[in-house]
Amino acid sequence: MLAQIRQALDEAEGRDPELALPYLREAADRITQLIDEAMATAVLHGQASLRAAGAQAGLTENAVGPRLARTHSLAAYADERGRVTASAVARARYDLENGQPRLPAEQLESLRFKSRRAPG
């Protein structure tokens, strides 16, 4: 993942700002994914709370749940609102300790802005 981030940043370097934007967006998306996965690992294996993991990443506690819901290890524990809660993390830890972690049902995509207006 870090190699892909470096490659995207290398591609952006020296380009006109307009041409650099897609590469910078790719790097930012991959960094966000890396942060989210690190938070998931911290709450699952490091025994960090949602609040503590979020604080370490510079996020509020409310921002952590939706981001954890996009991770490989915790996506299957998201609620109907698309959030991972403290009780879901406790369940995920229990399942992991018993060797039966849930697997995500589908590939998750990162949150992205989607324009409501048609281009043009």
Regions found by a protein language model. Give the residues of each.
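Short Lys/Arg-enriched helix C-cap and helix-to-coil transition segments
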Residues: 74-94
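The alpha-helix within a helix-turn-helix
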Residues: 43, 53-54
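Short, Lys/Arg-enriched N-terminal segment that forms or immediately precedes the first helix
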Residues: 14-28
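Helix-turn-helix/homeodomain-like alpha-helical modules used for DNA recognition
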Residues: 92-120
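Key DNA-contact positions within bacterial/archaeal DNA-binding proteins
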Residues: 62
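Short, amphipathic alpha-helical "recognition" segments used to contact nucleic acids or chromatin
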Residues: 28-47
